[in-house]
């Protein structure tokens, strides 16, 4: 039944949900990759769709920006709609020289400056990591499709406009691949409910070089990431 933030009926979500931050990216995926896609929720214009990809039933829904927003939607999907797997597909800022604009980054784990997982985990640090089976499937699919990917630790930030840019040098030293704003929250919710989660990202900005993509490009052109993720769930 509908929740405070999702109006879909029971059974309208597939067991696998792809979750971009931007609801218009969810619409783009539904319009361009899914067959027989149906809009099943649009509360607060957070669009969600269910359709099929090569015969596989799949849903896609926006999460909004930041840990609090994705935590709300992931909780309701896992707890109230029986969703088993959520794969965040989004954008990130690279912090290493060997990672370029439009490269694909897969978040094996997510460090963070957010406090939400400490609140969940009795005020001690929780190692927020992806589900191995989802991770392996995406990496194997990337190899099969000949798509190069970077796999490793990412950083989930609470602030987009950080007052502490010196943190990026520390991230690079410790092998962080890129910065985004949701993965650690998603991984924490998945762990809380015994479900599966993964994050697959396209580099939209490079923190060191200042290169960036436009908002229109972020909405519609990251097709390698979308295709890779959909192929991995077949």
Curated annotation (Swiss-Prot):
GO molecular-function terms, A-Z: purine-nucleoside phosphorylase activity
InterPro entries, A to Z: DeoD-type, Nucleoside_phosphorylase_CS, Nucleoside_phosphorylase_d, Nucleoside_phosphorylase_sf
Disulfide bonds: none
Keyword Transferase in record: yes
Keyword Protein transport recorded: no
GO biological process: purine nucleoside catabolic process
Gene Ontology CC terms, in alphabetical order: cytosol
Membrane-traversing stretches: none
Class of enzymatic activity (EC top level): transferase
Pfam families: PNP_UDP_1 (PF01048)
Binding site for a purine D-ribonucleoside: 5, 180-182, 204-205
Catalytic activity: a purine D-ribonucleoside + phosphate = a purine nucleobase + alpha-D-ribose 1-phosphate; a purine 2'-deoxy-D-ribonucleoside + phosphate = a purine nucleobase + 2-deoxy-alpha-D-ribose 1-phosphate
EC number(s) from the headed UniProt entry: 2.4.2.1
Active site, per annotation: 205 (proton donor)
Positions that bind phosphate: 21, 25, 44, 88-91
Keywords for the protein's UniProt record, in alphabetical order: Glycosyltransferase, Transferase
Subunit structure, as described in the record: Homohexamer; trimer of homodimers.
Family designation: Belongs to the PNP/UDP phosphorylase family.
HAMAP family with a match to the protein in the record: Pur_nucleosid_phosp
Function as written in the Swiss-Prot or TrEMBL entry: Catalyzes the reversible phosphorolytic breakdown of the N-glycosidic bond in the beta-(deoxy)ribonucleoside molecules, with the formation of the corresponding free purine bases and pentose-1-phosphate.
Name of the protein in question: Purine nucleoside phosphorylase DeoD-type
Organism of provenance: Colwellia psychrerythraea (strain 34H / ATCC BAA-681) (Vibrio psychroerythus)
